[in-house]
């Protein structure tokens, strides 16, 4: 039997959408084919769209703080490993700090990249990323897979604090 759970809270639904998109992104980036890197960029743009919600960052920070408070309540419990508890609380603290220190929304730094934004504006148009519409993008797709992966890693670097916060 398949069980479908419907989260009623819009904030939780948004976080689940982002979790899904980050999972897709981490599957696509390591691949070698240009089409996989095309869809990795599509996913980056989708993450930027979903993450553009004004209160998302504060919602994730509140969730991290809530989890930290719950875990602190387990201190002194003889059935809980203090070392494991300290490790998880440390991970939460690191994720909280990284996300809190990030200026603006996730992916906001990418909006300054005119080349990426030209792709973003054409990517939703059916067939809008043809080689004659975006010759520079077509040329990028012809680069070696490792070079494309390095570019993707550089572009998605600003998204990782949010991903790490969601993972916890």
PLM region spans:
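Surface-exposed peri-terminal alpha-helical interaction modules
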Residues: 1-168
